[in-house]
UniProtKB/Swiss-Prot annotation:
Cross-link entry Glycyl lysine isopeptide (Lys-Gly) (interchain with G-Cter in ubiquitin), positions: K49
Region (Disordered): 75-149, 195-216, 229-252
Gene Ontology BP term (one): nucleotide-excision repair, DNA damage recognition
Note: Present with 10900 molecules/cell in log phase SD medium.
PROSITE patterns, per the entry: UBA, UBIQUITIN_2
Species this chain originates from: Saccharomyces cerevisiae (strain ATCC 204508 / S288c) (Baker's yeast)
Role noted for this protein: Plays a central role both in proteasomal degradation of misfolded proteins and DNA repair. Central component of a complex required to couple deglycosylation and proteasome-mediated degradation of misfolded proteins in the endoplasmic reticulum that are retrotranslocated in the cytosol. Involved in DNA excision repair. May play a part in DNA damage recognition and/or in altering chromatin structure to allow access by damage-processing enzymes.
Lineage of producing organism: Eukaryota, Fungi, Dikarya, Ascomycota, Saccharomycotina
CDD domains reported in the protein's UniProt record: UBA1_Rhp23p_like, UBA2_Rhp23p_like, Ubl_Rad23
Location of the Ubiquitin-like domain: 1-77
Name used for this protein in its record: UV excision repair protein RAD23
Length: 398
């Protein structure tokens, strides 16, 4: 018999006694009975990994006295499809069917209320759809800016110091649920990160130098921001970038990233432009100030990309356009084994695809995600399985 304690985001504890041979699915069933929900809504996390239903308690390494974090997702609302009854055909006027003609008024009268029922159900269906959109919008994911500060304050109310909370959020890529899990269970060694570089007050107060005559791009469109900044500073990128870096006191072409981040960004831009947007999203989640920094200094960002791809910005923008149009990244073990990473298609690219990568991708697919999506996120996260799982659950879970 193994005694385990299950905790959630609110630090509610649910003790359960299990057999080592019990599967995770059986464990979820017992836990669901204790907290009054369905086992399909429960996710169990231990040591930074989502436990699979098919494995047993002993196979997951759970021992007597261990603590497991559980998260309960919102129950999907099911819409009942209302089918409109067929309209009664007009009665014939032939002499042989006079009886049916005489009976038609009563039939039409009884069919009228039934025909109006679907019309009355339309607002209810619209209300259900609105409720689903609201629930989807409120699903917790990455938090940045003011929302991140509010999250820190809420977690501090649980008894943690601000430094501990910020460290956990950085390790969890700004995912509140995962950060609380790390505070309860400890941050894995491979996710411990050094303190981020503090941005100077001059950089925060520096006004944007983008041209005011051109139409401003959407706030969330980093590519349009960067492209507009590149056009505005065409022919003078070196001068503008040098002035910006001099004001910030940093090296040329620096926008506050670590060396590892720059290497990953340049590698993705050079060999796989389609994965640039997921990588930027991942980096922005770890460095909340990066997004504002790029929008305030688009010319520095463009200069860095140009340096990475040899002044061929068109390839980067075409890769981003292809990604938006829905092209998928296709990587197969056979192609990698035969050294065929570079195909004939325009969207092909070469990657190191090992059997370990195939196993990791298969495990992520077992969580219920499409293989094409898993491959994109997995390689965008530099083959970090835990980071890929975090992004999949945060941004792509239904």
């Amino acid at each position: 018999m193994v005694s385990l304690t299950f905790k959630n985001f609110k630090k509610e504890k649910v003790p359960l006694d299990l057999e080592p041979s019990n599967t995770i699915l059986e464990t979820k069933t017992k836990l669901a009975q204790s907290i009054s929900c369905e086992e399909s809504q429960i996710k169990l996390i231990y040591s930074g990994k989502v436990l699979q239903d098919s494995k047993t308690v002993s196979e997951c390494g759970l021992k007597d006295g261990d603590q497991v974090v559980f998260m309960v997702s919102q129950k999907k609302s099911t819409k009942t499809k209302v089918t409109e009854p067929p309209i009664a055909p007009e009665s014939a006027t032939t002499p042989g069917r006079e009886n049916s003609t005489e009976a038609s008024p009563s039939t039409d009268a009884s069919a009228a209320p039934a025909a109006t029922a679907p019309e009355g159900s339309q607002p209810q269906e619209e209300q259900t759809a609105t409720t689903e959109r609201t629930e989807s919008a409120s699903t917790p994911g990455f938090v940045v800016g003011t929302e991140r500060n509010e999250t820190i304050e809420r977690i501090m109310e649980m008894g943690y110091q601000r430094e501990e909370v910020e460290r956990a959020l950085r390790a969890a890529f700004n995912n509140p649920d995962r950060a609380v899990e790390y505070l309860l269970m400890g941050i894995p060694e491979n996710l411990r990160q050094p303190e981020p570089q503090q941005q100077t007050a001059a950089a925060a107060e520096q006004p944007s130098t983008a041209a005011t005559t051109a139409e401003q791009p959407a706030e969330d469109d980093l590519f349009a921001q960067a492209a507009q900044g590149g056009n505005a500073s065409s022919g003078a990128l070196g001068t503008t970038g040098g002035a910006t870096d001099a004001a910030q006191g940093g090296p040329p072409g620096s926008i506050g990233l670590t060396v590892e981040d720059l290497l990953s960004l340049r590698q993705v831009v050079s060999g796989n432009p389609e994965a640039l947007a997921p990588l930027l999203e991942n980096i922005s989640a770890r460095y909340p100030q990066l997004r504002e920094h790029i929008m305030a200094n688009p010319e520095v960002f463009v200069s860095m990309l140009l340096e990475a791809v040899g002044d061929n910005m068109q390839d980067v923008m075409e890769g981003a356009d292809d990604m938006v149009e829905g092209e998928d990244i296709e990587v197969t073990g056979e192609a990698a084994a035969a050294g065929l990473g570079q195909g004939e298609g325009e969207g092909s690219f070469q990657v190191d695809y090992t059997p370990e990568d195939d196993q990791a991708i298969s495990r992520l697919c077992e969580l219920g995600f499409e293989r094409d999506l898993v491959i994109q996120v997995y390689f965008a996260c530099d083959k970090n399985e835990e980071a890929a799982a975090n992004i999949l659950f945060s941004d792509h879970a239904d």
